[in-house]
Amino acid sequence: MAEQQNPFSIKSKARFSLGAIALTLTLVLLNIAVYFYQIVFASPLDSRESNLILFGANIYQLSLTGDWWRYPISMMLHSNGTHLAFNCLALFVIGIGCERAYGKFKLLAIYIISGIGAALFSAYWQYYEISNSDLWTDSTVYITIGVGASGAIMGIAAASVIYLIKVVINKPNPHPVIQRRQKYQLYNLIAMIALTLINGLQSGVDNAAHIGGAIIGALISIAYILVPHKLRVANLCITVIAASLLTMMIYLYSFSTNKHLLEEREFIYQEVYTELADANQ
């Protein structure tokens, strides 16, 4: 039971095991493996942006007109090595505590649902912004490329905040040192989320994915926390309901027949395939 009371504070080497962070480590290694595959085997074009589009980046003109598969794939892609390094570091640091707090099944559910949901939220947000601006009537096709695990990471960060709030307020640790450490970790996570969102205000950052991932992660974790830990069937039902709601949202918003969107979709694919044909000559 001590493990459940103190997931964010490893007291001694004896309490640490590789198995306790196996899922977090697997997710980090998966992101690294996909990136190396991406740059070694899946980059036939000179343009980095075109390669990302070809491989499955989240482009709202494509994702909202049938390419729903871009949501899960884009969360495993990264634009460059620095982007990958920062995300993997954040995933490892935050994921360790989250995995020990919620367990592997819940962590995986929060990570996947938050990541895919963040990509959907980002795609629709971009469409909403542009369709309600003067850019919508412009003849230029504006492409925003969304890649990275940051939406999923924001989801597990928000879930960690929810867990620590419950621990600090409702079940404070009897040891003052551990109690202070948990408070510091809570404050640090809140500060990290706030700084990420503030940094996302600058151009070139997909802040909609950050916001969407954080909201989804928080909602799922609240549902998990409200259900007693031992009720596995109830926790499974929460996961199924969350996944079903996400699937329904994808179905409702990812098959648009908007003429303007479809024209831009055709233009983007034509440009990429032309570049691909030229590269193969």
UniProtKB/Swiss-Prot annotation:
Effect of mutating residue 150 to A: Loss of proteolytic activity
Record annotation: effect of changing residue 149 to P: Loss of proteolytic activity
Membrane topology: Multi-pass membrane protein
One Gene Ontology term from the biological process aspect of the record: proteolysis
Active site per UniProt: 150 (nucleophile), 210 (charge relay system)
Principal location: membrane
Transmembrane segments: 16-36, 76-96, 105-125, 145-165, 185-205, 208-228, 233-253
A matching Pfam family: Rhomboid
InterPro entries in alphabetical order: Peptidase_S54_rhomboid_dom, Rhomboid-like_sf, Rhomboid_protease_S54
Disulfide bond positions: none
Claim: Protease is one of the keywords in the record: yes
One example GO MF annotation: serine-type peptidase activity
Any single GO CC term annotated in Swiss-Prot or TrEMBL for this entry: plasma membrane
Annotated catalysed reactions: Cleaves type-1 transmembrane domains using a catalytic dyad composed of serine and histidine that are contributed by different transmembrane domains
The protein's Enzyme Commission number: 3.4.21.105
Function according to Swiss-Prot or TrEMBL: Rhomboid serine protease that catalyzes intramembrane proteolysis. Mediates quorum-sensing and the subsequent regulation of target genes via activation of the Tat protein export system. Catalyzes the proteolytic activation of TatA by removal of its N-terminal extension.
Family to which this protein belongs: Belongs to the peptidase S54 family.
Protein name: Rhomboid protease AarA
Gene name of the record: aarA
